[in-house]
UniProtKB/Swiss-Prot annotation:
Keywords: Cytoplasm, Lyase, Nucleus, Stress response. GO terms for molecular function: glyoxalase III activity. The gene is hsp3105. The keyword rRNA processing does not apply. It comes from Schizosaccharomyces pombe (strain 972 / ATCC 24843). This is Putative glutathione-independent glyoxalase hsp3105.
Amino acid sequence: MDERHEAAGETSEKPKVLFLLNSYYGPFYDDGDNTGVNVVDLYEAFKVFEENGFDIVIASDTGDYGFDDKSFRDPAIVDETQSIFSNPDCSLMKKLKNIARLDRLNPSDYVIVYIPGGYGCSFDFPHAKVVQDFLYRFYETKGIICAVAQANIALAYTTNSDGQALCTNRRVTGCTWKDEVQNGVLNVMNRLNFYSFGHIAENIGAIFESPPVYVEDPFIVEDGQLFTGSNTNSAKGVAMEAVRAVLNYDG
């Protein structure tokens, strides 16, 4: 653990985590559903950081967001999310109501940036210079970047001080073309010239580790400052590993 993370664990001040959402909400699926932020990726990690006493800030490059329609109907969390998102006084809804614009935030204020998935990432992150600049400056502070599923492409489109992608020569995981087939979106992605993170990572020299199983099991890879999860079921685990790294405990 580096000095920055040790200090966060020892101080009485709450460590701060930034949830960085993609800002796209619009058409994607063949059946007419829109994509955006995966609500499961957001909610599962939010619970972990909140329960461990982190100060949570939510932002996107534009200050806008929308939830992926299909993720909001995920049967694994539908009952819980219905109660959460119908309550304007819950902590998550209050944070979302006050979502910040990324260019108004200081990267050095945070010890973790957590990026939830959703196919909106493929529309947003390859072109969002504000996101790329923020992540570059945050990475230089030695903070931890957590990314899940489609969000991992942000690591491929952000360069470090050497001009290489953040994930070049790093062990990472994320969605593969098999996952896109499983999700029924491969034809859509081909039509839009979108690529899976696995394809992108291998083409820029990342050390991509494919998950042995989709859906059922989480699959998490840590390498230095990068904590990546292969799928939505990895969101909770990625957040927990980042908490352990910052607070230096084995719980």
